A protein has these predicted regions:
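Alpha-helical transmembrane segments of compact multi-pass small-molecule transporters, enriched
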Residues: 38-42, 95-110, 121, 190, ...
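Alpha-helical transmembrane segments
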Residues: 66-69, 114-128, 178-193
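Membrane-interface interhelical linkers
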Residues: 1-67, 77-86, 135-156, 186-238
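Hydrophobic alpha-helical transmembrane segments in multi-pass integral membrane proteins
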Residues: 42-53, 104-119, 158-172, 224-241
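Hydrophobic transmembrane alpha-helices of multi-pass small-molecule transport proteins
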Residues: 105-108, 118-137
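Residue-level recognition of membrane-helix boundary sites in multi-pass small-molecule transporters
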Residues: 2, 20, 30, 91, ...
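Hydrophobic/small/kink-forming positions within alpha-helical transmembrane segments
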Residues: 12, 70, 74-78, 100-105, ...
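Structural motif at transmembrane-helix junctions in multi-pass transporters
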Residues: 26-27, 79-95, 175-181, 232-250
Length: 255
């Protein structure tokens, strides 16, 4: 349960930081790019003793799968940040957390998690509780936003759900406790590489201008972001990949 608690704390802090960065006028994209650089460095520092050639040879499928996953992290994380800033913290958090129905439903459907009426009741109560907690504030906020911004939480719901589903699938199919370090490191490394390439292009075309404070904000963001995934994988391993329990419980507590 400690891993689950740490996952909740780290994940919740990300939404708060997005809101703070908006108020401080910090370029979100640059912060996210530096955040993934920090995540990659953390992954190497924490896991470097375990990163042997033999481990790579044994778990090359995990490396490839996590690298492909990492390429999806950047746009999804950026979308969550944009939605938090323009559609509001509450509706974005609601959409992100309600996305648990995708990985949790998949876990039950394919038999990763055992079906029980008690579990289904808890699952339904979790969804209802999240909806009721956020319904009032989100309604007020969305009325005040532009029409396009109203759809941002919907995009967050879809992308976050598919991302969590992919993490669950890869963790179940390829990753093991032994290869967990490789999974985390190469997921963030791929996101960092694509982010740096995109940032260089944008700076060259003068679509954005370099912000030194974005580096510091990226460092602050990167620490909880790395450990949110690191402890999520440990939580899934601890609960035997039971996504129907882990994701609803985690998301309900974050709300």
């Amino acid at each position: 349960m400690l891993y689950l608690f740490l996952t909740i704390i780290c994940t919740a802090s990300l939404f708060i930081l997005f809101r703070v960065y908006s108020n401080l006028k910090i370029d979100l994209f640059q912060s996210i790019v530096w955040n993934y650089v920090v995540c990659s460095i953390l992954g190497f520092v924490i896991q470097h003793d375990q990163l042997t050639q033999a481990l790579y040879d044994k778990h090359m499928a995990t490396v490839i799968a996590s690298s492909l996953l990492g390429s999806c992290f950047l746009p999804c994380f950026f979308l969550i940040g944009i939605s938090t800033q323009h559609a509001g913290l509450t509706p974005t958090t609601m959409a992100n957390k309600l996305s648990m129905v995708i990985p949790a439903g998949f876990a039950i459907a394919v038999g990763i998690a055992p079906f029980s009426w008690f579990q289904m009741l808890a699952f339904a109560m979790g969804i209802i509780a999240i909806y009721l907690v956020t319904k009032k504030d989100s309604s007020k906020r969305i009325v005040q936003t532009k029409s396009f911004n109203q759809f941002l939480p919907l995009f967050v719901f879809i992308s976050a759900g598919l991302l969590d589903l992919t993490i669950l699938y890869i963790n179940q199919t390829f990753a093991t406790p032994e290869s967990g370090g490789l999974f985390t490191l190469h997921t963030f490394l791929a996101a960092a590489i694509w982010g740096i390439i995109a940032l260089i292009i944008l700076l060259t075309l003068k679509k954005v201008y370099f912000q030194s404070k974005a580096i510091l904000s990226g460092i602050i963001l990167g620490i909880p972001n790395y450990f949110s995934v690191y402890y999520l994988l440990k939580t899934l391993n601890y609960f035997n990949h039971d996504g129907s329990f882990v994701f609803p419980m985690m998301n309900l507590c974050i709300i």
